[in-house]
């Protein structure tokens, strides 16, 4: 069995024969029952893979979905103009990094669909591109934004200021205003949009980056979509029965005992009032591949912005976790934070 650890491309997972836990029935529901969505999930929880899956679906890549749930649901497989923007690979502590990233994104789109004759600002240029794409293809545009909140999280504790036409403001406020203006396009270009999906690890207040356009449908705690990211126990037992059995032998326990150990370490996420238990996919896949239960998520998934904020305080770990930590009673270093993360 090939485990797609670190692979965020749906196309690569399918074409290269990696194991895929089928979520395409929910993808179909998203695409056909709504228009503008927001989803918040922890890091390393499959958000980028979900965005990639949506991209392939809206590009009409029918061949990639053969044998999956959506194969029997979708009949048209239209190819829409898709605009995919990910902030995940960027670092935003430096001034004007966000400006550059957005400019490159819009410029690339303009090279395909053309520029607006009077568009000057980033938001007006993007609006013009969406309109051009609609006219050129006859299909309304799809916009997918991954890690929408990273330009803000990266600068939450930044003390740097930027001089604007209205005076000096903090870098966080500058990035917030820039994103607010950019996302306002979704309201102005509504007639040219087929689908909009934003994902991240946090949701900022309603008066921040989303206030410039109609509020998206926040499905973060929706019972219908609680299993959209992550792995349920039913999915784990169905897809990964063989590696669990193999792992149980190395741990000297039976199958049920191994399931209980995996459940204790990686289960326990809940994303709706239904309280369906969700396993952390990154940690679970690593454990099954390596045959070893470890804190895999902490090594790569710890929210750095939270670490930076917590370093300004000294917190009692017992009060935070309910666990007794001898000789490690204060949350003042990065290693100490690992006790909170599975």
Predicted regions and their residues:
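Phosphate-binding site recognition
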Residues: 1-342
């Amino acid at each position: 069995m090939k485990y797609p650890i670190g692979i965020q491309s749906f196309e690569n997972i399918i074409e290269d024969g990696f194991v895929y836990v089928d979520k395409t029935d929910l993808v179909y529901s998203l695409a056909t029952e709504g228009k503008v969505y927001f989803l918040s999930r922890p890091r390393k929880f499959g958000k980028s893979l979900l965005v990639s899956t949506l991209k392939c679906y809206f590009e009409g890549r029918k061949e990639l979905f053969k044998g999956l749930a959506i194969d029997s649901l979708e009949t048209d497989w239209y190819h829409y103009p898709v605009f995919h923007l990910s902030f995940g690979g960027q670092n935003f502590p430096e001034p004007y990094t966000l400006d550059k990233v957005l400019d490159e994104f819009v410029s690339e789109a303009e090279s395909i669909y053309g520029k607006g004759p009077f568009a000057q600002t980033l938001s007006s240029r993007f609006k013009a591109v969406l309109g051009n794409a609609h006219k050129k293809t006859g299909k309304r545009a799809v916009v997918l934004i991954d890690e929408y909140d990273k330009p803000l999280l990266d600068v939450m504790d930044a003390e740097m200021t930027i001089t604007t036409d209205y005076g000096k403001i903090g870098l966080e406020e500058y990035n917030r205003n820039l994103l607010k203006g950019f996302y306002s396009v979704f309201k102005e270009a509504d007639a040219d949009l087929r689908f909009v999906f934003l994902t991240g690890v946090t949701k900022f207040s309603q008066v921040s980056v989303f206030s410039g356009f109609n509020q998206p449908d926040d499905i973060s705690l929706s019972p219908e979509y609680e299993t959209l990211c992550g792995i349920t126990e039913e999915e784990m037992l169905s897809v990964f029965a063989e590696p669990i059995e193999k792992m149980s032998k190395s741990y000297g326990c039976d199958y049920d005992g191994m399931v209980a150990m995996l459940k204790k370490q990686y289960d326990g996420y809940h994303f709706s009032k239904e309280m369906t238990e969700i396993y952390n996919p990154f940690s679970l896949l690593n454990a099954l591949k390596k045959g070893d239960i470890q804190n895999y998520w902490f090594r790569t998934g710890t929210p750095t912005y939270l670490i930076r904020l917590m370093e300004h305080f000294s917190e009692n770990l017992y009060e935070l976790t309910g666990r007794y930590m001898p000789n490690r009673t204060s949350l003042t270093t990065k290693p100490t934070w690992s006790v909170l993360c599975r």
